[in-house]
Regions:
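Receiver (REC) domain switch-region micro-motif
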Residues: 13, 22, 102
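N-terminal Rossmann-like dinucleotide-binding module
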Residues: 1
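Short, well-ordered coil/turn residues at beta-beta hairpins
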Residues: 25-26, 210
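NAD(P)-dinucleotide binding in Rossmann-like oxidoreductases
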Residues: 185-195, 199-221
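Predominantly a Rossmann-like dinucleotide-binding segment in NAD(P)-dependent oxidoreductases
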Residues: 68-73, 78-189
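Beta-strand-loop-alpha-helix segment that lines the small-molecule cofactor/substrate pocket
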Residues: 21, 27-28, 32-80, 94
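Short amphipathic alpha-helix with an adjacent loop that forms part of the alpha/beta core around
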Residues: 9-17
């Protein structure tokens, strides 16, 4: 097996002529550039979530896929688990009648994992994921809950999301994680320990999504 290392190692990988698909499972910020490079070099791509970090990147992926005629698939694994597939099948067969409200979540206490995320050099005390949570507010990992719900509610198959409001708690656990790793006070941890998002669709249906990777509680989505 060949190994390609370094921040730009993926470019050499994508230039190979003996592979058909590039599976992307890096930190979030590298999903987009690796996917674009792969498609530019004639490879299909399968991307772990999130596939893009802003709206422009979403459109760039779409346009590149259409231009190169290469598949660009988002690997939202929660859309394909047994419970979600079974529930989707029941919804599509009318078992629940018209579904007008749905809940989804990503509630996953990451305390056993924070120390294992990739760090950018010896000076990086946080790792990429804790650093991202410190810098960004809101639901930063929405698709585990939102993906299956969107399928069940026929989003982009006759309905669309129209309005959104989100509210979060203050940061207690996140702030303490940074302080423990840096030995200094953290007064600007932006991501609340728990975020709740409400979305209303054009057809009058309501989605509730929750995000919590900080507090100790059972895994739930």
């Amino acid at each position: 097996a060949a190994v390609y290392s370094g921040e730009k190692g993926y470019e050499e990988l994508c230039k190979r002529d003996d592979i058909d698909l590039v599976y992307i499972a890096t930190d979030w910020l590298h999903h987009f550039p690796v996917a674009m490079c792969a498609m530019e070099n004639g490879k299909n791509v399968a991307i772990e979530v999130p596939s893009a970090m802003n709206l422009k990147e979403c459109w760039d992926l779409i346009n590149m896929s259409e231009k190169t005629r290469k598949h660009c698939m988002i690997l939202e694994n929660c859309c394909y688990d047994w419970f979600e597939m079974n529930t989707l099948n029941m919804a599509q067969h009318g078992v629940f009648g018209e579904v007008i409200r749905a809940q989804g979540a990503y509630i996953h206490n990451l305390s056993p994992f924070w120390n294992h995320y990739w760090k950018n050099g010896e000076s990086d005390k946080l790792g990429w994921r804790l650093d991202y949570n410190m810098r960004h507010r809101g639901d930063v990992y929405a698709t585990h809950g939102l993906g299956p719900v969107a399928q069940a509610l026929d989003i982009h198959r006759g309905d669309r999301m129209q309005t959104l409001v989100a509210m979060d708690t203050k940061s207690v656990v996140g702030k303490s994680l940074v302080e423990a790793r840096t030995d200094s006070a953290c007064g600007n941890f932006r991501n609340g320990d728990h975020t709740t998002t409400l979305i209303r669709t054009a057809n009058g249906k309501v989605i509730e999504i929750q995000h919590n990777v900080m507090t100790p509680q059972p895994y739930n989505r």
